[in-house]
Amino acid sequence: DLNYIQNASARNLKRQMASTIGLVVRDLDNQFFSALARGVVDTAADQGVLVVLCSVDNSEQAESGNARLLRSQQVDGVIYDSGFHENARSLLELQALGPVVLVDERIPGLDLPSVVADGRRGTREIARHVVKLGHKRFACIAGPSAHWTSEQRLAGYREGLAMEGLEPDQMLIRHGDYKLESGYEIAKELMGLPKSERPTALLCANDMMAIGAMEYCRSSGIAVPADVSIVGFDDIPMARLLSPRLTTVRQPAYEMGRGAVQLLFTMTQSGPDATPPDPFAVDVVIRESTAAPRAE
């Protein structure tokens, strides 16, 4: 009896499965992305597959560096959620390594499978909820312009207003970068408008920007939700710890990470025509950061 640990790479090669995969993800300080990464790592580990993790800062140099790193590690495929896809060349470089699965985004013009949530439905429903509270002056702290996920969430907010009889073109729109600081700065601008123009509800494209907006309001003596209602998107753990707790849309980050790995494994074994899963369902979570507007 030879006591030995079977080599995972050899075992996976024997069964025609990946032995190492890459994960390109942005902003691990954001609890959504860290939960997604945990889903990827846990699911890969269940199959004895290693994950090479690359975190990016949304620059072309970082994207190219990640492609070089993953090539040097001889990964068998890549899960990609960097949010920076103006540099399509780096994605083509990644495709040369093996299958590429997008998660939480789609890229027009590139035929890449993706694992996403139904964010448009989520923002549509949460916007309708806020309108039903009596709000009429809205602003949206949207994500980066020209990003598919950001556009879907903005479209849902606009549809929700229209479904409740409001004119979506009247909603002020400012684009942030999904980080807390941009939510803070945009809220500072919006809440500094003349009172007759100031929004009574801020619809944010993610929780981090919503938290930044809430922090600006707290530091400036603006009461949430008495003076302004604020909603987010993701339902990161921090959203439940705020005071007031954040009304938001919950999307299943961990399960999306798992789904991306499962799709990648299927592609490595069966070829590139594997069918992506249907969009993951989302849930509107009503908490204390939204209420009826103050009577004028």
What are these regions (language model features)?
Residues 2-77, 162:
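Amphipathic helical "hinge" segments at domain boundaries
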Residues 25-35, 53-62, 114-125, 141-188, ...:
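Hinge/beta->alpha junction and helix N-cap segments in small-molecule ligand-binding domains
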Residues 57-58, 80-128, 146, 166, ...:
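Flexible loop/hinge segments that line or gate small-molecule binding clefts
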Residues 63-74, 182-196:
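Short, well-structured alpha-helical segments in soluble
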Residues 74-82, 139-141, 173, 195-206, ...:
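Periplasmic-binding protein-like
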Residues 189-296:
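Flexible loop/turn connectors
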